[in-house]
């Protein structure tokens, strides 16, 4: 959990994370203790020609560009009428991974059974209904307990969350604290802080949701979080080995397909897509499975623990990965001992200039007890 005066892991715009001490008031400056940056911009990926890796060399024999895909296993058919707001995702086999990020390599074959998936991210209206019915209080709304944070000054044990707070001038991209602030009173009811509200934003994705919050909602709704493999299979919509959920062109025919950041990150958003932050769900075209915002808008929780070497371990098993549930434990070399879950889909802060993990196969990561104003979720249901 992120608190003023404590070290924290924050999800940044491109789905990467950095470690810093949140010990200043919003708007102040502090140097991060360590930082991670993107390994490759999406512009380089777009410039890649067929038959090349991200580095520009020939495809390896274990990469999809040189292989004809094996026949798909017979996809399952929809078992009856769709639950309200859900779409049927047919089971099948696909290529999972991406060239652009080391933790999304190598490409590997995965099979998932069919399942139902929410067409859209869970909205403020839906989450409010749950909160009223159950009295549930999210992690961001709870006052931290001193025994859970020994050594923290009492004045810093204040409920709140992390909010994107862009500077009014260009800044170097190696100090992410320049555009993130811990805001007392920020939570799903007050996305930008205590003076903000969700009135009139019922159809926007609920944010500032920690993993526990999402799981509790899922149990109430009779659903569950998707696995990372299920999310990516659904995200691709049957378009195997494509760069985006809709194909290989970022703006096919000049059409904007997802809510991402345009302009100069982080200080100047030209809002070419019409939204400076999260957009109402369903504001952009659905994918081939009828799912909205599977790329951009807000990051989404999955049930998998995060390990950057997980894909390699699947490949070394030498068999098709069937319904993978993720690794048994979490490990991030940049933060040994800090458990993290996988995020998928990217957000409204993803940008060509800075990072681009809204591409199909991109991965994010985050501590289970931490939410931000660009992190939400959607749910799935097993066939019955």
Predicted regions and their residues:
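Short, compositionally biased
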Residues: 1-195, 212, 342-346, 367, ...
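Functional-site microenvironments in short loops/helix caps that host divalent-cation chemistry
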Residues: 58, 62, 88-89, 95, ...
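Active-site beta-strand/loop architecture of penicillin-binding DD-peptidases
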Residues: 374
């Amino acid at each position: 959990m992120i608190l003023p005066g404590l070290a924290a892991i924050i999800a940044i715009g491109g789905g990467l994370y950095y470690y810093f001490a949140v010990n200043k008031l919003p708007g102040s400056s502090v140097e991060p203790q360590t930082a991670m940056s993107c390994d490759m911009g999406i512009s380089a990926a777009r410039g890649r020609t067929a038959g090349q890796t991200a580095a520009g060399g020939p495809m390896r024999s274990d990469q999809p560009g040189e292989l004809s895909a094996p026949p798909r296993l017979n996809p399952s058919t929809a078992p009856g009428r769709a639950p309200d707001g859900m779409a049927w995702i047919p089971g099948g086999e696909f290529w999972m991974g991406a060239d652009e990020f080391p933790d999304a390599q190598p490409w590997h074959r995965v099979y998932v059974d069919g399942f139902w998936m929410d067409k859209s991210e869970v909205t403020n209206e839906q989450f409010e209904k749950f909160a009223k019915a159950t009295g549930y209080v999210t992690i961001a709304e709870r006052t931290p307990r001193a025994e859970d944070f020994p050594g923290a000054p009492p004045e810093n044990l204040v409920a709140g969350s992390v909010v994107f707070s862009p500077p009014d001038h260009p800044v170097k991209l190696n100090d992410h604290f320049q555009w993130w602030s811990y805001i007392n009173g920020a939570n799903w009811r007050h996305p930008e802080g205590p003076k903000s509200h969700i009135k009139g934003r019922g159809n926007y994705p609920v944010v500032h949701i920690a993993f526990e919050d999402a799981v509790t909602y899922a149990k109430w709704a009779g659903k569950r979080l998707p696995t990372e493999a299920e999310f990516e299979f659904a995200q691709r919509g049957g378009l195997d080995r494509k760069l985006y959920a809709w194909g290989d062109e970022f703006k096919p025919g000049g059409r904007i397909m997802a809510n991402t950041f345009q302009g100069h990150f982080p200080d100047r958003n030209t809002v070419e897509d019409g939204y400076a932050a999260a957009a109402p769900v369903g504001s952009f075209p659905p994918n081939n499975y009828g799912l909205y915002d599977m790329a951009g808008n807000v990051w989404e929780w999955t049930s998998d623990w995060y390990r950057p070497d997980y894909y390699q371990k699947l490949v070394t098993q030498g068999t098709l990965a069937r319904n993978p549930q993720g690794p048994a434990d979490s490990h991030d070399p940049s933060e040994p001992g800090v458990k993290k879950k996988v995020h998928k889909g990217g957000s409204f802060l993803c940008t060509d200039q800075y990072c681009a993990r809204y591409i199909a196969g991109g991965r994010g990561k985050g501590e289970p007890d931490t939410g931000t104003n660009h992190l939400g979720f959607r749910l799935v249901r097993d066939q019955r």
